[in-house]
A protein has these predicted regions:
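Helix-loop-helix module between adjacent transmembrane segments
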Residues: 45-48, 75-138, 153, 164, ...
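C-terminal membrane-solvent junction of multi-pass transporters and transport-like membrane proteins
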Residues: 1, 142-145, 323-331, 373-434
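Membrane-water interface regions at transmembrane-helix termini and the short interhelical loops
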Residues: 49-51, 75, 123-149, 211-215, ...
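Helix-loop-helix junctions that connect adjacent transmembrane segments
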Residues: 29-30, 108-116, 144-285
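Membrane-helix boundary/coupling elements in multi-pass transport proteins
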Residues: 56, 79-94, 203-216, 278-321, ...
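Transmembrane helix-boundary motif of multi-pass solute transporters/channels
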Residues: 1-97, 200, 206-209, 216, ...
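TM-loop-TM module centered on a large, flexible mid-protein loop between adjacent transmembrane helices
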Residues: 62-64, 69, 101-106, 226-300, ...
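Membrane-interface loop-to-helix entry segments
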Residues: 117-174, 226-231, 365, 371-377, ...
């Protein structure tokens, strides 16, 4: 069980999600605590229950296939793939943002330079392709590097809440607002929107623990018990990280495309006018650039995982067998990898056309999260719909947890068409998100039924 606690923290905590919470100001504390209660704990309960019923079938795809049928299982996998594809497609935008902060104020123009972002997108996906083709030999070191940098930056952010690099008795640090507030938040449409994004984005991912269910003694109970330990730790980490951002950046000016580079740039900004080298400033900028490299490393791992989905779909006869062929030298699905990289590159270039970086990031993030939301809706529906067919009926509290998870997920999906940054047209933003989401799922349904038709012939 104790191995599952750090695993849950690493899978759930994302260093960028504190930026969304920081938009709420000091009352973010209440939002994180509510998100733990209404999403994280229900998620842990449902994942633990499913892992207990199907202890050797790690993953939402298999649970949905057994409980609700092959179509539900396929749409789970399809929407997870859509989310992963869109998650990595913003690599050019995020890298440009990191570099603009890492090089200092004179490089601020980089963040919204469409040509440069397009160049970053193409070059970085070529790097990701090169890393993934040889397989796990290189990929595991890329993964270790990304994880190490994430942990380092998380600890650094929490440290910056208590230590201000350029503060002195003569020039003490002054927070732009209170990092924490015990006052009740004002409930508006925007604050509810922010809450759903905090909960859904910041606290999802726990279901990936189920991959190891077959290697865990009494997996269902172990996952639930470890979640009770991990939950308060995750809450403290997120609250401290968000408070750290608010100690340096006004809530209204938080940059959602790069909140971590932004806070590092603000915290380590030059504090003296002397001609000597400002090592604090150099450290901050170096950390920003290393974080950009780590982001590419993390996205390379996501591409590696996602590239196996077309291969498995090919084995099941859903798509052409062309995707299932392995490279004779590396024994990796090079064709699937190439297709995933090509699609992600195209989506990344398309999303930035005619919009600023903030709006493009929101469009990509929103469409991807619609896919992840459908994935979660199917998962939370399992305890409510499976009955006693597998020998275990979900009890009252388990069903209540499933309903809570369903409600938060559905609310988060409804708010995905509403931007939380300034956009040229809210109606155009909503139309782009809704239209792209419908098109993605229509394509998934068409592929499934075409595969079933061919399998019957």
């Amino acid at each position: 069980m104790w191995d599952l606690v750090p695993m849950q923290i690493l899978l759930v905590v994302g260093i960028t999600w504190g930026g969304i919470a920081a938009k709420q100001g000091g009352t973010h504390v209440w939002f994180w605590l509510a998100a733990i209660v209404f999403l994280f704990v229900p998620l842990a309960a449902v994942v633990g229950w499913c892992a207990q019923v199907w202890p050797l079938e790690g993953g939402v795809y298999q649970w949905a296939k057994f409980a609700l049928g092959p179509f539900a299982g396929f749409m789970c996998a399809w929407n997870f793939g859509v989310w992963a594809l869109l998650a990595v497609s913003n690599v050019g935008i995020l890298t440009a943002t990191s570099i603009s902060y890492g090089l200092g104020p004179h490089a601020a123009w980089i963040e919204d330079n469409h040509l440069l972002i397009a160049g970053f997108t193409i070059v970085l996906f070529l790097v990701i392709l090169a890393v993934n083709l040889p397989g796990f030999g290189i990929g595991r070191w890329v993964s270790h590097f990304g994880t190490a940098v994430t942990v380092m930056v998380t600890l650094l952010l929490m440290g910056l809440l208590f230590y201000h690099p350029h503060a002195s008795p003569a020039h003490p640090h002054v927070n732009p607002q209170a990092p924490f507030s015990v006052g009740k938040p004002v409930f508006t449409l925007m604050t509810i929107n922010l809450f759903t994004k905090i909960a859904f984005n910041g606290l999802g991912g726990l279901e990936q623990v189920a991959v190891f269910a077959g290697e865990t003694r009494n997996a269902g109970r172990a996952i639930m018990r470890s979640a009770w330990i991990a939950a308060p730790l995750i809450a403290v980490i997120y609250i401290l990280m968000t408070g750290s951002m608010l100690a340096y950046i006004p809530a209204a000016k938080v940059d959602l495309t790069g909140p971590i580079p932004q806070i590092l740039a603000a915290a380590f900004a030059g504090g003296s006018g002397s001609a000597s080298i400002d090592w604090g400033l150099m450290l901050g900028r170096a950390t920003i650039l290393v974080l950009a490299v780590a982001l590419v490393a993390q996205y390379a791992v996501i591409v590696a995982e996602t590239s196996r989905l077309p291969m498995v779909a090919g084995w099941d006869g859903m798509i052409p067998a062309w995707f299932t062929r392995l490279d004779p030298r590396w024994k990796t699905p090079t064709r699937s990898i190439a297709v995933i990289v090509a699609l992600a590159t195209g989506l990344g270039l398309l999303a930035t056309y005619g919009t600023g970086a903030q709006e493009a990031f929101q469009v990509i993030n929103s469409v991807g999260n619609v896919g992840y939301g459908i994935y979660y809706l199917i998962m939370f529906a399992i305890p409510l719909m499976v009955g006693e067919r597998f020998g275990v009926r979900a009890g009252f509290w388990m069903q209540a947890a499933a309903v809570s998870g369903l409600a938060v997920t559905a609310l988060a999906m409804a708010f995905l068409v509403l931007p939380i940054v300034d956009v040229a047209s809210k109606w155009n933003f909503a139309a782009r998100v809704a239209g792209a989401s419908l098109a993605m799922n229509a394509a998934g349904v068409a592929i499934y039924w075409n595969g079933m038709r061919q399998a019957r012939q």
